[in-house]
């Protein structure tokens, strides 16, 4: 059984259109991430590649089943 660091609503994530990935800051300084495809497949766990923390993503599964994207601010990564 997974132990979640936190539960975060998808609206609190930043969305990168190029990679179709949602990002949320992790306490370690890296970012939790989950792809649009993972959400469409019903997966609701975002992982941080910089540490072992995972978070539960709160989102409307019906919204992603239709291939829709939740409008959130884009992140310009430079």
Swiss-Prot record:
Molecular function per GO: metal ion binding
Biological processes annotated in GO: protein histidyl modification to diphthamide
Free-text note regarding domains: The DPH-type metal-binding (MB) domain can bind either zinc or iron ions.
Keywords for this protein: Iron, Metal-binding, Zinc
Family: Belongs to the DPH3 family.
Record carries keyword Metal-binding: yes
Biological source species: Homo sapiens
Source organism superkingdom: Eukaryota
Keyword presence, Transmembrane helix: no
Residue intervals of the DPH-type MB domain: 4-60
Binding site for Zn(2+): 26, 28, 48, 51
Annotated protein name in UniProt: Putative DPH3 homolog B
Classification via InterPro entries: DPH3/4-like, DPH_MB_dom, DPH_MB_sf
Gene3D superfamilies for this protein: DPH Zinc finger
């Amino acid at each position: 059984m997974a132990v979640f660091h936190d539960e975060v609503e998808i609206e609190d994530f930043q969305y990168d259109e190029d990679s179709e990935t949602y990002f949320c800051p992790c306490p370690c300084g890296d970012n939790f991430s989950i792809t649009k495809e993972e959400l469409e497949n019903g997966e609701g766990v975002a992982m941080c590649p910089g540490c072992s923390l995972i978070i539960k993503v709160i989102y409307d599964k019906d919204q992603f089943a239709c291939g829709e994207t939740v409008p959130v601010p884009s992140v310009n990564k430079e």
